[in-house]
Amino acid sequence: MKTKTALFVLAIMLMVIAPINSNSISKSTTDNLKEAFKGETTASAKYADYAKKAKKEGYAKIALLFEAASKAEHIHANNHKAVLEQLGVKVDKITPKYTVKSTKENLEDAISGEGYESTTMYPGFIKTADAENSNLALISFNYAFKTEQKHLKLYKNALEFLNSGKEKKLSSKYYVCPTCGNTYEGDAPARCGLSMTSKEKFLIIK
């Protein structure tokens, strides 16, 4: 896989200067972008409702994690949508479908979803986009992929703490990069490790 160091924001600027013909992008990549957009849109809505459920059950710290992840997934969805629209592809409105259960079950569902995205879905999408030199899609996919890996670890940790009765020891603050959705627990560096966005612009969930 080629190393992609360009920032998403810079890529958008380049697109304005030299628009891309959507006919030059393969159907497989546009289909993957559509699927990723649908998945991230659903995850964002689902996690927002999971956060409300966690609050009702008295798990304030887990609610914060769900809120942070929801914002991150919304950013991923917007990035995928931006690439599709730049390519001249119509993006249909998504009506998310999911079921809210207990916080424990919701965490298990989140772990399953993040596990699929970080081990199967995004690696496959990235491989295809890389082979097709679909650089903008590749950047957007990589942002989501690396963030979902972090979300998977955070959710697994939260479930472990919940099962052991230590939920209150979880982090009480999360930072989310508005450019790529990268999520930091407790504290964050001066700049995002993925997009190099300044910490001053990060979303804070506490």
Roles of regions detected by a PLM:
Residues 21-206:
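Non-heme di-metal
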